[in-house]
Amino acid sequence: MNAGSENSTPRISEPASPLAQAVHIGDYRPRLRIGEYGTVASVGDGIAWVTGLPSAAMDDVLMFEDGSWAVVFALTKKRIGAVLLHQSENLTAGTPARLAGRTLDVPVGETLLGRVIDPIGNPLDGGRPLETRNRRPLDSPSPPIIARDFVQQPLYTGTRLVDTLVPIGKGQRQLIIGDEGTGRSSLAIDAVLNQKGREVRCVYVLIGQKRSTVVGTIELLRNYGALAYTTVVVGEAGSLPGLKYLAPFAGCAIAEDWMARGHDTLVVYDDLSTHAQTYRELSLLLRRPPGREAYPGDIFYLHARLLERATALNPANGGGSMTALPIVETRLGEIEAYIPTNLISITDGQIYLDSDLFAAGFKPAIDVTRSVSRIGGKAQHPRIKEEAGRMKLDYLQFLELEIFTRFGARLESGMEARIRRGRLLREILRQERLQPLPPEFQLAWMTAYNEGLLDAMPPGSVQHALNELNSALRNGSPPLEASRTDWLTWLRQNLPEPARGEA
């Protein structure tokens, strides 16, 4: 074999001598690693029962050998009940389990704007993984009383009826309640769309919704430019019950982080009826004692703990706010049911959507007589509050008078004029979805109505006149702080001819 072939032959290292091996063994220092390991006893319906792990505590994260993981949800003397958050096909009885040494948290921060995620922070929009080191616990204590401030700033939803008669303030918790198909989600989506350009960051939480509904909502937000300042948290109908249960807490934690940084936020929980049903399902599977309507006894505490985190912080704590719009479904208009009454007592007011009004074509189908905002009026702009008070009185009197006309009762001429104006007002309050309106427009039409500038218009043409008025507003109008005289002067110059002529 020549020299070239010797150089090309790979060299094999010689084994270490026995003396060298002895030196290495002598240097070795054993380090004991102590850990707890358990075993899956049974698994099914999104629940895993685990034996062992004596130091496990509530809300601890469990890791399974096959890659699945769960969160501790029930503790008994012999077993641990865990709610699965990721389940592989290989998870079976006998799979080893261990404690992860942490509790549940979710990524937070600027990178979440415009993203669609699941409740544990995994992207669902096909985008790149979230690049943030900031995380926040899903379940954290609500801000203390000393850190809170009064609700003082209005949050405009863009809906005529809401911004005038049932106003909402930043930091308020306002329930949206009604039967299925009455426009509850549409009202919340309009509120999100109206935050464009208002420096309000939004979180829309979809709980137990069908995939088609989820996709439709996301596309709607994207098409109207609202996804740029919104994060969507999805626990869809086909996902594990644990993900549906955690969805509102994840959305709240994301908004809570922005609030702590001094931003105004809006959170929509769509909807908490499904969330309550999911919690009931998990509780029954974990063999917790059932209470009224088979819900566990702490269902009220669960939702109160979630919604109490929405507030307005004082300037010393950043001055941010979190406004919550929880949605709840009723059946056949029964607002006295268990979950609706719970949420009514927790929140600061409710917007009730009536199925009869919806069937009659009045949209949004808000029943003013059963809707209330307990603290929103304090945050309402003084000029809007002044005009809304006069208009609301007229509308409520009209609703009472209209009942008598159904029995064929004869009315005096003054009463007939009131009914005529009331029907005109009802037509004004109609509004198509996805058409949020600025507060200046709300003040303009209420001032015009209260002054009688619209009385000459037939109800069928008043919407066209209001559209022209809104177009004129875009070209310039007095500020909200302007006097009533200034607004009346501007209205007489910009209202369509029929109204201006009669004025």
Curated annotation (Swiss-Prot):
Topology versus the membrane: Peripheral membrane protein
PROSITE patterns in alphabetical order: ATPASE_ALPHA_BETA
Q: Where is this site: Required for activity?
A: S371
Q: Known Gene3D superfamilies for this protein?
A: 2.40.30.20, ATP synthase alpha/beta chain, C-terminal domain, P-loop containing nucleotide triphosphate hydrolases
| Identification of the protein by name | ATP synthase subunit alpha 2
One GO CC annotation: proton-transporting ATP synthase complex
Q: Which HAMAP family match?
A: ATP_synth_alpha_bact
